[in-house]
C-alpha cells in the first residue's frame, strides 16, 4: 500500500495525507470496500486517487493558477505531457527553476519530468479541457 501511494504522490506530503484520509474516511465502509482492510488495497488506493482527482482543493487550484500566471510554465508542462518533448534539466533556466520551485517538476537524471502522477493527471486534464474549448 505504501509503495503504491508513493508511486502516485512521490511523497508529496499534502497528497499522501489526502489519499490516506480519503481511504480511511470515504473508501473504507463504502459498498465496494466494506471493511477498513478492504480499502487499504491496490483497488482501494486507486479509488481514493479517483476521488482526489475529481475534487476541488487548494493545491490543485494553486497548480492551475500558477500555470495561468506563468506562460513559460504552461509551455514546459504542455511540451512534456502532450508532445513528449525531452527537456534537459537546467536550474539556471528561469522557467525550469520556477516549475521546480512550485513542485511541478523534478530533475530525473538530467531530464525534466512532472513531479508525480497525480500532478501529471491534473495538468493533463487541464490542458485537455483547454484544447477542447479552443477548438
Where are these regions (language model features)?
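Winged-helix-like regulatory helical subdomains adjacent to P-loop NTPase cores
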Residues: 1-102, 108
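Short, amphipathic alpha-helical interaction segments positioned at domain boundaries
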Residues: 57, 119-134
Amino acid at each position: 500500500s505504501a509503495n503504491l501511494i508513493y508511486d502516485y504522490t512521490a511523497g508529496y506530503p499534502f497528497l499522501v495525507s489526502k489519499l490516506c484520509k480519503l481511504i480511511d474516511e470515504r473508501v473504507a465502509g463504502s459498498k465496494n470496500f466494506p471493511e477498513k482492510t478492504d480499502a487499504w488495497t491496490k483497488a482501494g488506493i486507486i479509488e481514493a486517487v479517483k476521488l482526489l482527482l475529481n475534487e476541488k482543493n487548494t493545491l490543485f487550484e494553486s497548480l492551475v493558477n500558477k500555470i495561468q500566471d506563468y506562460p513559460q510554465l504552461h509551455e514546459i508542462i504542455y511540451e512534456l505531457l502532450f508532445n513528449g518533448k525531452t527537456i534537459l534539466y537546467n536550474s539556471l533556466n528561469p522557467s525550469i527553476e520556477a516549475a521546480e520551485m512550485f513542485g511541478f517538476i523534478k530533475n530525473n537524471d538530467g531530464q525534466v519530468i512532472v513531479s508525480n502522477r497525480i500532478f501529471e493527471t491534473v495538468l493533463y486534464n487541464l490542458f485537455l479541457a483547454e484544447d477542447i474549448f479552443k477548438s
